[in-house]
Amino acid sequence: MQTHDGKTAVAIIGSGNIGTDLMVKILRHGKHLRMGAFVGIDPESDGLKRAERMGVPTVSTGIEGLLSHPDFGSIGFVFDATSAGAHARHEQLLRPHGVRVIDLTPAAIGPFVVPAVNIEQHLDAPNVNMVTCGGQATIPMVAAVSRVVPVEYAEIVASISSRSAGPGTRANIDEFTETTSNAIVRVGGAQRGKAIIILNPAEPPLIMRDTVYCLVPGHADRQAIVESVERMASAVAAYVPGYRLKQTVQFDEFKGRMPQETGSAQAPRLKVSVFLEVEGAGHYLPSYAGNLDIMTSAALATAERIAARQPVAA
């Protein structure tokens, strides 16, 4: 639903790190979006207080307060930045109202969306899931390899600063691995996938670092893989400026067996290794929190793309 200025009003549920950073991004950079409501459950939270200072309508009674808010009818999008468990309930309550839902939890009720890979396939979905921070960073690389050559197995390792992992992130650790592993297959195109997350306690905090391993046929065109990876990195950096390749793509011959394989060793294969780092934009969160920045940036890019298709009110 759009106003005379052509912008769609949105609500954000979740006043923690991710929700607050997303709010700041929309206020500063929203092209087709404007803040309609910022929703939390703790009136003393930094996020709700910051929203009030920035002139954003706030709700401190959770989704029930949002649904009863006098301006709820003008809301076109709801971003859910709470937890996987809470999102299932939120989705049930929101669905009858017909608002579009952008899910930043690992609940995965709607289809997985990684903007650089598959956003055009899900522009009409009522609920889209942003996978996980590790998924947003690494699945584009798996997809970049799989569009050139079949990927038998892909494994991602996401290392994030422990300081950037708030209560929501820690509560969702188990869902992180399951959701990301599923998305490596369903979005990345790998035949099998595995995800590992590391909370790095180092001080001073280190920025997000990700490693992507893909197992491909030994005859794969290495140059084509490199070029595809570099193109994909540029596509992601278009909406996450701090996203970059840490070094050149690495290739190693792999002649052994995977843990689940039996019988004699397979024909020689290649292990493709891609090394990434993600530096945050520093809108609300420190620059080392690239894991949170990539989630909010991907969610914003997704909603902007969907909103851009909607007719402008006269």
Curated annotation (Swiss-Prot):
The active site is at 133 (acyl-thioester intermediate). One of its GO terms (molecular function) is acetaldehyde dehydrogenase (acetylating) activity. Keywords: Aromatic hydrocarbons catabolism, NAD, Oxidoreductase. Its EC number is 1.2.1.10. One of its GO terms (biological process) is catabolic process. Gene3D superfamilies: Dihydrodipicolinate Reductase, domain 2, NAD(P)-binding Rossmann-like Domain. It is an enzyme of class 1 (oxidoreductase). This is Acetaldehyde dehydrogenase 2. It comes from Pseudomonas putida (strain ATCC 700007 / DSM 6899 / JCM 31910 / BCRC 17059 / LMG 24140 / F1).
